């Protein structure tokens, strides 16, 4: 009984913390092969443990805050697609931007994509899966990378998009800053592709 009470207390404390920090999201590591139809993908993803009921919100205050993971690539990796789950899009229309940044030995990082990788979603009260295929060829050489997402723009009376919450070490880059700020949860954004041997 005591263990149950402690567990509930921890969950309540975590959800209170998450509610205060709900702008912050995402996570990923190279994982096992995923088979989609006849196509095989290596997944650059680690969603972490799903938090029941809890959600992460992107809204007006989170615009231009990048939220993502630091990923180690031991071999060249060709990115094929991104996927994520959205619980509800309360905005009439929301535009998101994905970023790939190479992290140098001194901690500095630069955007790798010449063309911004954007995707949009329209207002919906239903849970939906989104898949994004980049037009630009994205091949990551061995090294350390930051992969993140930000809300670029939203329209409508309630400019908010809600995602499922996962427990996972992630990082935030504030607007006009280069510092990687650690946070403890994400939305489970997946990056799939293939290792180049």
Positions of PLM-derived features:
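Bacterial N-terminal signal peptides
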Residues: 7-13
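Positively charged n-region of N-terminal signal peptides that target proteins for export
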Residues: 1-4
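Exposed aromatic-hydrophobic patches
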Residues: 126-137
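Solvent-exposed serine/threonine-rich low-complexity stretches and specific carbohydrate-binding patches
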Residues: 111-123
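A short, structured loop/turn motif at beta-sheet edges
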Residues: 104-107, 135-144
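Beta-sheet-rich sandwich/jelly-roll-like modules and their strand-loop junctions
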Residues: 24-103, 144, 150-197
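Boundary at the C-terminal end of the N-terminal hydrophobic targeting segment
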Residues: 18-22
